[in-house]
A protein has these predicted regions:
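Outer-membrane beta-barrel porins/channels
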Residues: 1-295
């Protein structure tokens, strides 16, 4: 609760109906959030299918295709904690407000359990590799990810006693299907050493109207290098480094956010909804180590 000045003014008016002598706690809090919800839960095991086929056309060309099915990761008994600002004076005021009838829902949150599910999208991948000489190999992969399965996220806060819904935190996602392109090459220097280099472009499934800090939310451009050391006939050591950056230096967008406390206070849904805007950039350094044993 907090952040948007227009909504804060609406909420102050609603709160003062419950406590007419209420001081302006938003001014007292400054940039700090008055209340927040901390949700925690472990997803149940989900079962999916991976299937693929490889065709070695000749010694130079190979084609491949893989399919990965969609999974739905479900959380049925997550926990929730209602946290208030670390300020004794404001905390005392909030404690009194939570006793008001219109905020009775908030009183029941700490004993509620979290139920939600998150889809992991299906994907289709096509690949081709070309070996012009015994030492050189080049490859191209196209991966089509069916992100449209992630159209919304509903988090239900449920009373465990009678299994009734205390509150639903609903958010539209409206993800779009995406295409990722990966290209790379490797050179076998000798029996002991193989060197690799590559890059990929991974399209963002999120439109600017629904841009938020979650991942994946930006089109990513990555460069990779790696090598394989083969000290013995039965052991390979793989080392790799990748630099991931956003395709745009900075991406600007917004996300429709509904203030649930405003709705509880009786403010209409239209007034309780505002845009959470921001400018985003992303970069990462990745390192990997792999060991392959042959028997």
């Amino acid at each position: 609760v907090g952040a948007d000045n227009a909504q804060n003014q609406l909420l102050m008016g609603a709160l003062q109906t419950a406590m007419p002598t209420l001081p302006n706690i938003f001014e007292m809090a400054g940039d700090r959030s008055l209340m927040s919800l901390a949700l925690k839960g472990d997803a149940k095991m989900a079962v999916g299918v991976n299937a693929g086929i490889m065709w070695d056309i000749n010694k130079q060309w190979s084609l491949g295709f893989t399919y990965r099915s969609k999974l739905r990761m479900k959380v049925n008994s997550g926990s929730i904690a209602l946290k208030t600002i670390d300020d004794p004076a404001i905390g005392q005021i909030l404690g009194q407000l939570l006793q008001a009838p219109q905020f009775s829902t908030l009183q029941n949150l700490s004993s509620a359990v979290v139920k939600t599910e998150l889809p992991l999208p299906a994907s289709l991948t096509w690949g081709v590799s070309f070996r012009p000489t015994p030492k050189w190999e080049f490859a191209v992969d196209l991966q089509y990810v069916l992100w449209s399965a992630y159209d919304r996220l509903d988090v239900e806060l449920v009373n465990p006693t009678d299994n009734t819904t205390v509150m639903t935190l609903a958010s539209d996602k409206n993800y779009s299907n995406t295409l990722a392109v990966r290209i790379g090459g490797q050179y076998r220097v000798c029996d002991f050493l193989t060197a690799r280099m590559g890059m990929y472009v991974d399209e963002s499934p999120v439109s600017s109207d629904y841009l938020n800090p979650e991942t994946p939310s930006m089109t990513k451009l990555a460069y990779t290098v790696g090598l394989t050391l083969r000290p013995t006939r039965w052991l390979d050591i793989d080392l790799a480094y990748g630099y991931v950056n956003s395709a745009d230096p900075e991406r600007t967008g917004s996300y429709p956010y509904t203030n649930s406390v405003l709705e509880l206070a009786g403010v209409g849904a239209a007034q309780a909804t505002t845009d959470f805007s921001g400018n985003y950039t992303a970069r990462a350094h990745t390192f990997s180590l792999g060991l392959n044993f042959r028997f």
